[in-house]
From Swiss-Prot:
The modification N6-(pyridoxal phosphate)lysine is found at residue 200. NCBIfam families: PRK05355.1, serC_1. Pathway: Amino-acid biosynthesis; L-serine biosynthesis; L-serine from 3-phospho-D-glycerate: step 2/3. Its cofactor is pyridoxal 5'-phosphate. This is Phosphoserine aminotransferase. It comes from Oryctolagus cuniculus. The lineage of its organism: Eukaryota, Metazoa, Chordata, Craniata, Vertebrata. The modification N6-acetyllysine is found at residues 51, 127, 269, 318, 323, 333. GO terms for biological process: L-serine biosynthetic process. It holds the Pfam family Aminotran_5. Binds 2 pyridoxal phosphate molecules per dimer, each cofactor is bound at the monomer-monomer interface and forms contacts with residues from both chains.
Length: 370
């Protein structure tokens, strides 16, 4: 069956996968390339799986122009695993065992809290009353003795995105790119470590890609579990323990799809078009739809908004979500910590998908506006 599905999935992750990728997975599920077995059954030590993992790594390197002095590794544990792995691997780079954190939303806050288990954490700006903007980097209080500076490129819950790489005065920069990885080009050479869970823009849940500069390997704290130690995993070619084989395979297929559709630059162009369609409706709704994020820091990936007023009319929001569901549009409910509505526009979400939502939003506005 290759007929398009009726459901439009705006899920925040796990998220929509390209239809052609799903068909490829379906085609190869029982018999991978004539081997008579599924990737689900394949030994991670086999030459056939080595081809899969090498292909996925090579595509990451090609699509992001990853310099040769960086390792690309595939790990388990998701973004939360990396909240621990980053300090365990890097906070010991300097004797003071401290790190700078930029906290612009729920995920960077969670990362900073986890890092406190392993050293001293310095939040480089005054605590934000609400996560609706990125504090001006020129005001950040960077600690010259910090082992690294950490930030989250896109906050999925609050819809705040960096559209720039912060200048951290030569410090080692670590970035959680889980929710905008390969949605735009990135200069990898500006970072010490980049990590991203695959389940938003580049695949299915279960695998996290980590890009780490060679000179940062080998400084893990003594208590760092081996499965989280970058040097151990890099020297083992991500095979220190049994990796998430099927998720790595799916990621390879999605990366191939991104490559065939113009790469990161084309993804950014599409993301701009898709997000602008929704933001325009919000901004022209005379306060019916309200996005709390400052316009210059709005995310192209995740658009949170309230309906009726800035605090949200919950009855109206429920009606909106129920009606969207009737129209086969799913996973639009805002995160439980903020409420409201959230539209996630990852790479596989098409312009046609967004047009369908935009049309519904306009109709809903006309029906309920005074």
């Amino acid at each position: 069956m290759d007929s398009p599905r009726q459901i439009v999935n705006f899920g925040p992750g796990p998220a929509k996968l390209p239809h052609s990728v799903l068909l490829e997975i379906q085609k190869e599920l029982l018999d991978y390339k004539g081997l008579g077995i599924s990737v689900l059954e394949m030994s991670h030590r086999s030459s056939d799986f080595a081809k899969i993992v090498n292909n996925t790594e090579n595509l990451v390197r090609e699509l992001l122009a990853v310099p040769d002095n960086y390792k690309v590794i595939f790990l388990q544990g998701g973004g939360c695993g990396q909240f621990s792995a980053v300090p365990l691997n890097l906070i010991g780079l300097k004797p003071g065992r401290c790190a700078d954190y930029v906290v612009t939303g729920a995920w960077s806050a969670k990362a900073a809290e986890e890092a406190k288990k392993f050293g001293t954490v310095n939040i480089v700006h005054p605590k934000l009353g609400s996560y609706t903007k990125i504090p001006d980097p020129s005001t950040w209080n960077l600690n010259p003795d910090a082992s690294y500076v950490y930030y989250c490129a896109n906050e999925t819950v609050h819809g705040v995105e960096f559209d720039f790489v912060p200048d951290v005065k030569g410090a080692i920069l670590v970035c959680d790119m889980s929710s905008n990885f390969l949605s735009r080009p990135v200069d990898v050479s500006k970072f010490g470590v980049i990590f991203a869970g695959a389940q938003k823009n580049v695949g299915a849940a279960g695998v996290t890609v980590v890009i780490v500069r060679d000179d940062l390997l080998g400084f893990a704290l003594r208590e760092c579990p081996s499965v989280l130690e970058y040097k151990v995993q890099a020297t083992s070619s991500s095979l220190y323990n049994t990796p998430p084989c099927f998720s790595i395979y799916v990621m390879g297929l999605v990366l191939e799809w991104i490559k065939n559709n113009g790469g990161a630059a084309a993804m950014k162009k599409l993301s701009t078009i898709k997000s602008q369609m929704i933001y325009e409706i919000i901004d022209n709704s005379q306060g019916f739809y309200v996005c709390p994020v400052e316009p210059r820091n709005r995310s192209m990936m995740n658009i949170p908004f309230r309906i009726g007023n800035a605090k949200g009319d919950e009855a109206l929001e429920k009606r909106f979500l129920d009606k969207a569901l009737e129209l086969h549009m799913i996973s639009l409910k805002g995160h439980r910590s903020v409420g409201g509505v959230r539209v996630s526009l990852y790479n596989a979400v098409t312009i046609e998908d967004v047009q369908k939502l935009a049309s519904f939003m306009k109709n809903f506005l006309e029906m309920h506006q005074l």
